[in-house]
Amino acid sequence: MSFLDRTARAFLLTELVQGLALTLRYMFKPKVTINYPYEKGPLSVRFRGEHALRRYPNGEERCIACKLCEAICPAQAITIEPEPRDDGSRRARRYDLDMTKCIYCGLCQEACPVDAIVEGPNFEYATETRAELMYNKSKLLANGDRWEAELAFRIAADAPYR
């Protein structure tokens, strides 16, 4: 760039004019901002939010205490204590999930052979204390009961990719 070009750019402020033109161009385009608490954007069927434990249609919990989710969790956020039953099967006596450790990777959901643990569509679960983010089995089952219709739809929509 020659001396004359640099001088012309400095005095004519061409970069400034280009920036102002860009600003004016976007000023009159429609806004893309979502007013969050009042408007919510669409979520993918693969969105990974708050965890839930699902039940079978007859009301029995799905978790067979195989501990695959506990083994695969990279953050070690899941703790399961199995309890044997009279018929030889087993269920989880204790199923604890530390949401402060969870990294929402979805590996627990992928590892579960019976689709017991799933990550649902809820992303609004702020709490006032840290202790409220330690989910036990009853809290996870309550989440599953509350979101069952949505969870079943998401699992069915994602089935071709599993």
Curated annotation (Swiss-Prot):
EC number: 7.1.1.-
Residues in the signal sequence: none
GO BP terms: aerobic respiration
GO molecular function: 4 iron, 4 sulfur cluster binding; iron ion binding; NADH:ubiquinone reductase (non-electrogenic) activity; quinone binding
Cysteines paired by S-S bonds: none
Family: Belongs to the complex I 23 kDa subunit family.
The protein, known as: NADH-quinone oxidoreductase subunit I
Species of provenance: Paramagnetospirillum magneticum (strain ATCC 700264 / AMB-1)
